[in-house]
Amino acid sequence: RKHKNLKPFQCDKCSYSCVNKSMLNSHRKFHSSVYQYRCADCDYATKYCHSFKL
């Protein structure tokens, strides 16, 4: 798929498309209002685990 530029997984909220479902699931967090990663010491919260560092 990558070499043929096929992107069968399409976001239903924007024009984003990708080659696999896991990338689409990760992208869907962008549209979500849920911040599941929260700091225990302050008010910081994020949608993505890679943005959360101690």
From Swiss-Prot:
GO CC terms in record: nucleus
Location(s) in or outside the cell: Nucleus
Sample GO molecular function, one term: DNA binding
ZnF (C2H2-type) residues: 1-3, 9-31, 37-54
GO BP of this protein: segmentation
InterPro entries reported for this sequence: Znf_C2H2_sf, Znf_C2H2_type
Main location: nucleus
SUPFAM superfamilies given in the database record: beta-beta-alpha zinc fingers
Key words of the record: Developmental protein, DNA-binding, Gap protein, Metal-binding, Nucleus, Repeat, Zinc, Zinc-finger
Record's function text: Gap class segmentation protein that controls development of head structures.
Family statement: Belongs to the hunchback C2H2-type zinc-finger protein family.
Protein name, per record: Protein hunchback
Organism of provenance: Calliphora vicina
Gene designation per UniProt: hb
